From Swiss-Prot:
Residues 117-155 have a biased composition (Basic and acidic residues). Keywords: Disulfide bond, Ion transport, Metal-binding, Periplasm, Signal, Transport, Zinc, Zinc transport. This is High-affinity zinc uptake system protein ZnuA. It is found in: Periplasm. The keyword Transferase does not apply. Residues 1-22 form the signal peptide. Residues 117-161 are annotated as: Disordered. Disulfide bonds join C267-C322. The keyword Disulfide bond applies. GO terms for cellular component: periplasmic space.
Length: 326
């Protein structure tokens, strides 16, 4: 069970929830989902700038000059971490000495999982490199794939797809904003608590909708859904591409087709901002149903404070509709 508003520091709740006259920090975020969380916490006090634009790929993105200038002027960069956006780690060196970076994956309350399927407790130091190698196919193609597919090990950065992490991140965002703007600490805390309660209610809805789909295998474009499937007790998704959404080799595609046949997958889901023809080609000739496109980073969702809930609800509904059609 997710703990709702208790995640928000009680000390911060002691101040009034009305805006005070204060210098609200200039915040830059990496992806729309993080921007939505920050917007929920800031409320009417301010609006974060989101670097990754609609249709952008978080794993490989080129900043525009205007965005680089925004980074230079930012008081606070709130991002998932270099595991998701290594290009931003390099760009963040332009931040001023007075600026702060909050990597949400590094919050102590974040539940982190490895691509290899294991999980580990997050300590206070960075743990950006792991020695777990992960082979997806197990059908004799691993050696050939090693020459073509990217390395697939270390921390899975898509942690916001676990709603419990979303709640923890809201609390961490509120705490960080409050350090920069103590006069409005009560506003940030109250907004974070309200958003956390809303996520808790949505989580219960999704549990009810997804319970009938447990035990059914499905195919996705890239390996981004482990937190979601783990949280809701679903079977691990069969990923056509790896966690960085790199183009799969011919050997990997053959292995995926073998795995789909052996595992009895019933649905396949394309992904927003990626060519659906790849998914269609993988399931061609099979009886697998094609579901609605999933959008794990929220780059195709409606911008604003409601984007995170929209993303989770849309993902849960798409899975429930297709997997529950039997």
């Amino acid at each position: 069970m997710i703990r709702p508003s208790s995640l928000v520091l009680a000390a911060a709740l002691g101040t009034a929830a009305l805006p005070a006259r204060a210098e609200v920090p200039r915040v830059v975020t990496d992806i729309p989902v993080v921007g939505a969380m920050v917007q929920q916490v800031m409320g009417d006090l301010g609006q974060p700038e989101i670097l990754l634009q609609a249709g952008g790929d978080p794993h490989s993105y080129q900043l525009r000059p205007s965005q680089a200038r925004s980074l230079q002027d930012a008081d606070l960069l709130i991002w998932v971490g270099p595991e998701l956006t290594p290009w931003l780690e390099r760009a963040a060196t332009s931040l001023s000495a007075q600026s702060e970076m909050l990597a949400l994956l590094d919050l102590p309350a974040t539940h982190r999982r490895d691509y290899a399927g294991g999980e580990h407790e997050h300590e206070h130091e960075h743990e950006h490199e792991h020695e777990h190698e992960h082979e997806h196919d197990g059908h004799g193609h691993a050696e050939e794939q090693a020459h073509h597919d990217h390395d697939h090990s270390g921390t899975d950065p898509h942690a916001w797809l676990d709603p419990a992490n979303g709640q923890a991140w809201l609390a961490g965002i509120a705490e960080t904003l409050s350090r920069h703007d103590p006069d409005n600490a009560g506003v940030y805390a109250a907004n974070a608590a309200k958003a956390a309660d809303e996520i808790a209610a949505l989580d219960e809805e999704l549990k009810s909708a997804l319970t009938p789909t447990q035990g059914k295998r499905f195919v996705v474009f890239h390996d981004a859904y482990g937190y979601f499937t783990e949280h809701y007790g679903l079977e691990p998704a069969i990923a056509v591409s790896l966690g960085d959404a790199s183009t799969p080799s011919a050997a990997r595609l053959r292995a995926i087709r073998d795995e789909i046949a052996e595992e009895g997958a019933v649905c396949a889901f394309p992904e927003a901002n990626h060519d659906p023809k790849l998914i269609a080609a993988v399931i061609e000739g099979s009886e697998i149903r094609q579901g609605a496109a999933l959008d794990p980073e929220g780059t195709g969702a409606t911008p604003g404070a409601g984007l995170y809930a929209e993303l989770l609800r849309g993902m849960g509904q798409a899975l429930a509709d297709c997997l529950g059609a039997d």
